[in-house]
């Protein structure tokens, strides 16, 4: 789920990442962070100055490790430092306007950015295939990245996938850093909170209201995907997919 505040926070996190991990020069890191901020926020005067001072990045839509992806890269020859961006659950997926502006901003700052269409996220479902695709794209990106490593960046659900992917043995030694904004770090607690409006604190169960309606819908759709294959799973998944993302009581369909 994208929120207006999360993307600026993401840039702050990635600014720190670039400063400590990808560039030896602190000043260069701050200049690149400014490129990303201006490219994403597009303030009128500064955006024009950025376009004059930097070359237009190249954006293309192509499969990476079998996953449809937007790839943004700087003009000119590489290799470049590389980022894999894991989006949150949004119907616009990899073509979300804010995400595309962010990718262009990173490309103007000298990064190659991969924005994969992770399976399930466009319809609010997080499944094992979502993680497998994150890992697969990161491996493919690292194969051609400068230094053979990539930075993993994610927002919301994508942040959780980025954190989990970085732990996978297939990416051992191939991740330069991870930056996650508003990730879900305890999936069991998230599902409990989303579906019941309660959470555990030690041995106690405490109420937490209001639980975000869309979070409950994502949790329910994701849990339905994990049920054994069969007509019951199909009926539940179909019913949940028919619920509007803005429904304040999305689980009423299960009553």
Language-model features and meaning:
Residues 79-88:
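Short beta-strand element of the alpha/beta-hydrolase
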Residues 94-102, 109, 114-151, 161, ...:
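Catalytic nucleophile-loop/oxyanion-hole region of alpha/beta-hydrolase
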Residues 153-159, 181:
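Conserved alpha/beta-hydrolase "nucleophile elbow" surrounding the catalytic nucleophile
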Residues 15-33:
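Membrane-interface motif at the C-terminal end of an N-terminal transmembrane signal
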Residues 84-85, 113-116, 151, 177-180:
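Structural recognition of the beta-strand scaffold that forms the well-ordered cores
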Residues 30-78:
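N-terminal cap/lid segment of alpha/beta-hydrolase-fold proteins
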Residues 23-24, 164-255:
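Alpha/beta-hydrolase-fold enzymes
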Residues 1-14:
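N-terminal Sec-pathway targeting helices
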